[in-house]
A protein has these predicted regions:
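Acidic helix-start/capping segments at beta-turn-to-alpha-helix junctions
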Residues: 1, 33, 76-80
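Short, conserved phosphate-binding/catalytic loop or strand-edge motifs used
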Residues: 31-38
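Histidine-centered active-site loop/cap adjacent to the catalytic His
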Residues: 42-71
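Secreted/periplasmic serine-hydrolase-like ester/acetyl group-modifying domain
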Residues: 63-154
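Conserved small/polar residues in nucleotide/adenosyl-binding loops
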Residues: 156-158
Length: 158
């Protein structure tokens, strides 16, 4: 934001909302702030990058008492090097170089169920057809939808 632009304390707002609900929370703000120098958000979009989602997932796992993931568990695949997100489209910051979209998770042994049309149907973790269009971010899960369930079929339940 420009110097002197009105703003509000997002951390205080999040803390206040958490206290009012009394529900358990996950400190995503702290997890992302720890990695502020890394590409956790797209420069041209409001979404987390896959790297940001990795740190968010680890914050959730830690809050649940589970072992965090390691970056070495993944082999990132570059899906697109020409992603221009909604900030690019709406702000006039067209001098920024496009972002890169990475896929970190293999679709092997993963079942995705979508309710995109309002009824249960098979889904996909990555819908690569979106990579040929402007809305490349929708390549994740086929875009926004009311509900999507991912099941790891190779996970052993004890």
């Amino acid at each position: 934001l420009p110097q002197g632009a009105p703003s509000f304390d997002q951390a205080a707002f999040i803390q206040s909302a958490a206290e009012k609900t009394g529900l358990p929370t996950v400190d995503l703000l702290g997890a992302l702030t720890e990695h502020a120098g890394e590409p956790i958000y797209y420069r041209t979009d409001h979404h987390w990058t896959t790297c940001g989602a990795f740190y968010g997932a680890n914050a959730l796992l830690t809050a649940l008492g589970k072992e965090p993931l390691k970056e070495t568990d993944f082999t990132p695949e570059i899906a697109s090097t020409d992603f221009n997100g909604t900030l690019y489209s709406t702000s006039g910051i067209h001098w920024l170089a496009p972002d890169t979209i990475e896929y970190w998770v293999s679709e092997d042994d993963l079942r995705v169920t979508s309710w995109k049309s309002g009824k249960e149907e098979p889904g996909r973790l990555y819908d690569r057809s979106y990579l040929e269009h402007k809305d490349k971010y929708s390549s994740f899960l086929g875009g926004n939808q009311p509900l999507c369930v991912l099941e790891n079929l190779s996970l052993i339940h004890i």
